[in-house]
Amino acid sequence: MKRTKLLLSLSLLLWVHPLVAAPQGANATEIVTIDAKATAKPFPHFWEEMFGSGRATLTLRDSYRRDMRAVKEITGFQYVRFHDILDDSAGVYSEDKDGNPIYNFSYVDQIYDGLLANGVRPYVELSFMPSKLAATPIVHQPFWYQPIVSPPKDWARWDDLIRHFAQHLIDRYGIEEVSHWYFEVWNEPNIDFWAGDPKQPTYYELYDHTARTLKEVSPRLRVGGPSTAQAAWVDSFIQHDVENKVPVDFISTHVYGNDTAANVFGTNEDIPRDRMVCRAAKKVHDEVLASARPQLPVIFSEYNASYANEPDVTDSIFMGPWLADTIRQCDGLVKMLSYWTFSDVFDEQGVIKKPFYGGFGLVAEGGVPKPSYNAFRLLHMLGTQRIPVNSDSVLATRRADGSLVLVVWNYSAPEQPGTPKEISLQFDGLKGKKHATIYSLDADHGNALAAYAAMGSPVDPTQKQYEELKAAANLPAPEVVRSLAGGKITLTLPAKALKLVVIR
């Protein structure tokens, strides 16, 4: 997880509606007209189908499963991805005194049993290399737990490991279940998570062996890659698979909001954090469409606003507008966006020393929901049909019952204080008396980070302080507007605020 955007064509990112007036000045009210009867398009909730979560053995912790259930409750997510299912910490592979392979799937069973018992399926990242199978003991130094990133010493033994692993899963869970899983080959082989030399051809060798072996076990197993950082290698990867008749069922890659244009696009430009993810998604989307396999689904199996520890980003209310705008822009470009990660039960940089250190998770140390958790809670309430508007601060949807659900935000970069913003929503085509329910996430509502700062940012909060933080994280009861006068409602949004409006 580390990473980099081309301006997305507005014609692909926005449905332009002719009835929306743009603000006329810096402090002018933005008027957005929503046609309640407008033709809508399907709007799958691609941002909440899957989440990332550190490494495999963390799933055995009570705190991990607690946070997983909390996020499952507000999003209904179906898949979880993590590193290290083949690493020594999971105990899958060893050798006897004569060098013969020994397989042990005890931890694998406990890990996957725990996911399935909570209604979550594995998105299996096949990594990292067992020490006894590694060609050289090269480790990924930045990670506290030091995973081995070497190619295997023997390709036949790697194939045998993959074969035994896949067959065990089918024997335990049944092919009807496992055929719904995804198998992704490795993690970010284009950077220092892969020590093959040269990187690309040796990764393709790894992919070829793995994909073919999985399909030998069952053609119903879904396999894909290249799982690269910075949205890299996609066109080359597809070309390689087609030319060499290697199976591939999906494309996976990663990008982060603070990746650089040089790394993602090879250009010398400054791409802002709120544009990077979806410009990268557009790049990959177009590469797949132009390939010999244009129907391959695209999965960004890692993304976030930052790959660094930035409390003012991932712990803050900034994430509400950033997430909403990312969803607006990426709609139609991907099958899934997998947020890295759902929880700060996470140890890539070592054991967590304090809550709110800029971790990636939606839930902070101690089970405290962050503003990003509340943003996902609100975004889950959106409908499954998208109605066109031309505002870049509004996303309008319709539910199956005919109610309208809109999310409205006031974005500013994390390093900028931002200013309040007024948006007037004007509805055409509403029939009968309607009322609005308005949910708010901002500096004063649902913001545990502010409460943490107010108590002096303790390194080791007491249990009482943790309870106070959880209370501060709760979203307040929504405001109810009993009647929409003239079919419109005007919202004042503080800096970095997010509001969700339900019209019934």
Regions of interest found by a model, annotated:
Residues 1-8:
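Bacterial N-terminal signal peptides that target proteins for export
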Residues 8-18:
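Bacterial N-terminal signal peptides
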Residues 19-182, 197-230, 243-246, 289-295, ...:
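Non-catalytic accessory regions flanking glycosidase/transglycosidase catalytic cores in CAZymes
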Residues 57-58, 86-94, 131, 186-193, ...:
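Conserved radical SAM core fold
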Residues 186-187, 254, 301, 340:
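Alpha/beta-hydrolase-fold catalytic nucleophile elbow
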Residues 189-201, 225-226, 232, 237-241, ...:
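Substrate-binding/catalytic cleft of secreted carbohydrate-active enzymes
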Residues 227-252, 303-322, 326-331, 346-355:
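Substrate-binding cleft/loops of secretory-pathway carbohydrate-active enzymes
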Residues 258-269, 285-320, 349-351, 355-363:
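Active-site clefts of carbohydrate-active enzymes
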